[in-house]
Design a protein with these regions (language model features):
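Glycine-rich "HGGG/HGxG" loop immediately N-terminal to the catalytic nucleophile
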Residues: 60-75, 353-370
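Alpha/beta-hydrolase active-site loop
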Residues: 41, 73-94, 368-392
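Conserved hydrolase catalytic core segment
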Residues: 114-129, 407, 411-421
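Catalytic active-site module of serine/aspartate enzymes centered on a nucleophile-bearing elbow/loop
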Residues: 243, 248-289, 562-612
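Short, surface-exposed "cap/lid" segments of acyl-processing enzymes
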Residues: 16-60, 310-354
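The alpha/beta-hydrolase serine catalytic core
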Residues: 125-258, 262, 418-578
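N-terminal cap/lid segment of alpha/beta-hydrolase-fold proteins
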Residues: 1-23, 263, 267-314, 570
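Gly/Ala-rich beta-loop-alpha elbow adjacent to hydrolase catalytic centers
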Residues: 103-113, 134, 400-409
Length: 612
């Protein structure tokens, strides 16, 4: 697994185990939120193929993931198609394979078809086969799904009602879903696509994975179209796609489907070998959007990260973004990529971190559950990353986390004396214990089903066929999600008997003690909550509704923010978070400068005073 870049795109080469390969695969990821949801599955599909002797190149399209660009570029479709073509050529050059297979999912499958047609223009350049997983056959239907999902995440009014009839953004301004944007031009190009009406077949062999098999299946229609054009087509059910197409903190690899793909591409492969371990190249510098990014392996190669630094400057401080839930290092809505580069352009460094069980780290798990985000392992991983940064000369290290990442940031500051600042947003827990695991798993099945359904893009196809009403889904799933978050934050199982028999709120006691300790050690900490965030119930329980128990702690500040959604996926929320990061960094540097002046003058260091 080697890092590579081309044409502004960042990607990975998964080298094949065993003898020299003759066939390689280019993975074409879905787009927007679906790329985040499926990252775990796509990364492990690449690992599985490499272990079976098939090298794989996977990458982020321009404007997505770790690649260059802000996102929402008008020319997304033609640029992405050209990137797939370039990736195929790069795979051939790097591995010596003769045949290339394009393997795509959802819109990525559609882009693979378009790229295959473009490659066929060059003699000998056409792909040997296509693997199309739940392809977007009808672009207009795909856009309707996106609008429906946007309606689900539409803002609530003061009474908690959601206007499900309104799309997130009008079509003449493009479409924004969970902070991922489609420009009007890209929408027009996608809306005009009908794979089952394009002439001919894009490859001689095609494997289709159908996630909604039945009489109305668009994939079945596409299979018939390709067969009539002379292709050999295999169609298999993709029932386990629901394991993949959901929020990363609860998603898993669709093992059955991945085995089918590996067997189809490498039927003569020997018993599955372990995929090769990642190799750190001597020079991983990637000049992107006015900054420089380095791929780094931390903690004896157990963790992967992207170190983002100013171009030509020595940064005085660094911000560390740990994973949120099960998302990989780019962050929900690509937030950590955009924040990292914004910080670097302002003269600071940033590290986007994958703990050892997530993202692109070598030992990333094949499934995820919420309690794992709070487990001892990730806490130790983050502290090890802090040690790695300190060993490289960073004296000001700020942890910056969202939701479970806020918890990891707090724990890192408590465990590691090298942490000098913390900005934590919308924390739902300050203390995680065994009983919290039990509480998470004991919730009603209907609640978990609603949460999964709300995040499952495939359900929107059923909605478009009128199988269930949008308003009922919106109201039920939104209410369930709020209830689940409040239950986690309130933590009703965290009370215990004190020495004298009185009832003690263990999490309250822990949180207050943690803040007191950090303030004593002069760690600058900003505690942020959105004005309606479910985590405010926890904050009120631990610190008082007005944060009164924090008022006498000079280094601790608490804030209710009008523009801060829970997962920090919206643009205004990122702006709010960035503003507090800059305040925290500048506050540290001012204090450090004052201490340096005092030290030079032989004066004792000043005692910290309460923040206003």
């Amino acid at each position: 697994m080697k890092r590579l870049t081309f044409d502004g795109c960042a990607g990975w080469l998964h080298e094949a185990a065993g003898k020299a390969a003759t066939t390689g695969v280019v993975l074409c990821a879905p787009h927007m939120h679906e790329a985040m949801w499926t990252h775990r599955g796509m990364r492990h599909l690449a690992d599985d193929l490499a272990a079976a002797g098939v090298p794989v190149l996977r990458f982020d399209y321009y404007g997505t993931g770790d690649s260059a660009g802000d996102g929402g570029e008008p020319d997304f479709v033609p640029r992405a198609v050209q990137s797939v073509v370039t990736a195929a050529a790069r795979l051939r050059a790097l591995t010596g394979v003769q045949d290339v297979v394009l393997c795509g999912m959802r819109l990525g499958a559609t882009l693979a078809v378009l790229a295959s047609e473009a490659m066929a223009v060059d003699a000998g350049g056409a792909p040997a086969a296509l693997v199309l997983m739940a392809p977007v056959v009808n672009g207009r239907a795909y856009l309707r799904e996106l609008r429906a999902l946007g309606a689900f995440y539409a803002p609530e009014d003061a009474d908690g009602r959601t206007d499900a009839a309104q799309p997130a953004v009008a079509d003449d301004n493009g479409l924004e879903i969970l902070s991922y944007r489609l420009a009007p031009q890209a929408m027009q190009e996608i809306g005009s696509l009908r794979l089952d009406r394009r002439p001919g077949t894009p490859a001689r062999r095609v494997l289709l994975l159908d996630d909604v098999p039945g009489s109305a299946s668009a994939v079945a229609s596409l299979a018939q179209h390709y067969q009539q054009a002379g292709a050999h087509v295999d169609v298999v059910d993709f029932h386990d796609s629901r394991l993949l197409m959901k929020s990363p903190e609860v998603s898993a690899v669709p093992e059955t489907s991945w085995r089918r793909i590996v067997e189809w591409l490498a039927p003569d492969a020997a018993a599955k070998a372990a995929p090769p371990q990642p190799a750190e190249d001597a020079d991983t510098a990637f000049e992107v959007d006015g900054v420089v990014e380095h791929s780094v392996w931390i903690d004896n190669g157990r963790q992967f990260g992207v170190l983002c630094v100013p171009d030509g400057e020595t940064p005085p401080a660094i911000v560390v973004f740990p994973n949120t839930g099960g998302s990989h290092h780019v962050g929900d809505g690509r937030a950590f990529v955009l924040l990292s580069r914004a910080l670097a352009r302002r003269g600071f460094a940033a590290l986007r971190l994958d703990v050892s069980t997530l993202g692109d780290s070598p030992g990333a798990a094949r499934e995820m559950a919420v309690p794992r985000a709070y487990a001892p392992g990730p806490r130790a991983d983050v502290s090890a990353a802090v040690d790695w940064l300190r060993a490289r000369g960073y004296s000001h290290i700020v942890m910056a986390g969202v939701c479970s990442g806020a918890y990891l940031s707090l724990q890192a500051a408590l465990a590691n004396e090298h942490v000098t600042g913390v900005v934590m947003a919308n924390a739902l827990k300050y203390l995680w214990r065994d009983e919290d695991d039990a509480a998470h798993h004991s919730g009603p099945e209907r609640l978990r089903d609603y949460l999964h359904a709300a995040r499952d893009a495939r359900n929107w196809q059923r909605l478009m066929r009128g199988e269930f009403p949008l308003r009922k889904i919106v109201a039920g799933a939104a209410q369930a999600a709020r209830g689940a978050a409040r239950k986690l934050a309130v933590g009703g199982h965290s009370r215990q008997a004190g020495k004298s028999g009185e009832t003690v709120d263990a999490e309250q006691e822990y949180a207050r003690g943690a803040m007191t300790r950090l303030s004593r050690h002069r760690v600058q900490l900003d505690l942020l909550y959105g004005v309606d965030d479910a985590g405010l119930a926890l904050a009120g329980r631990c610190f008082g509704d007005d944060f009164s128990h924090l008022h006498d702690l000079p280094c601790i500040s608490a804030h209710r923010c009008a523009q801060l959604d829970h997962a920090m996926i919206l643009g205004p929320s990122r702006d709010t978070f960035l503003a507090f990061l800059m305040q925290n960094l500048r506050r540290q540097l001012v204090i450090a400068d004052a201490a340096s002046v005092q030290a030079a003058a032989g004066e004792p260091a000043a005692t910290a005073t309460a923040a206003g």
